Amino acid sequence: MAQALPGLDRSGAWEIPTRLNMAAQCLSHDPARLAIIDLTGDARRDVSFGTLSDMVDRLARALAQRVRAGGRVGVLLGQSPWCAAAHLAIWKIGAISVPLFKLFKYDALASRVRDAGVTLVLTDPEGRDLLGGLATPLMGDSVGM
């Protein structure tokens, strides 16, 4: 007898839920378990799922006051735990995250922001300067990052 595969029902079809929140699924691990190894600073920083979940909740509360489900939110941050938390927080409130890259020039940012319908961008001072009025910047330090 063949062994059942995770995610498949008895007939071999995928078990697809009617609703799925990617953020909740991603964060549904032991809070003490390692989620992210941050090597961007002077020293290694380990971020647990519990800490990441707290970061996500803080950002989600701030974003929920500004963005509706289905809204497009740009993320223009460096590669850090806060960048990961930003995407998860956006998904948690049912919005769509649009990854943006600080090495893009203005025209590349403009095409992505406009094509995706981004109106708000979670960023920092460097990112705000790169945006140049393309969308409303939401400064990370104003939401506890």
What are these regions (language model features)?
Residues M1-V47, T51-R61, E126:
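N-lobe entry segment of adenylate-forming
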